[in-house]
UniProtKB/Swiss-Prot annotation:
The name this protein goes by in its record: Prokaryotic ubiquitin-like protein Pup
Family classification: Belongs to the prokaryotic ubiquitin-like protein family.
Keyword Ligase set for record: no
Pathway(s) annotated for this protein in UniProt: Protein degradation; proteasomal Pup-dependent pathway
Keywords noted in UniProt: Isopeptide bond, Ubl conjugation pathway
Amino acid sequence: MSGQQSQINAGGGNGQGGDTPEFDAGQVSINSAGTDDLLDEIDGLLESNAEEFVRSYVQKGGE
């Protein structure tokens, strides 16, 4: 899934039509390649040593 890019479009306007002015829709592009790489790395760590992975994120001393 590396190299894929997701696109999210948000509509504008009030949805009633008529003579009311229309607003341009906002557009956001999200590059998910970095996220996919990070998730692949986490999966690899979990496969090799899940207990150590969990320990590294557990806070010590109730902090």
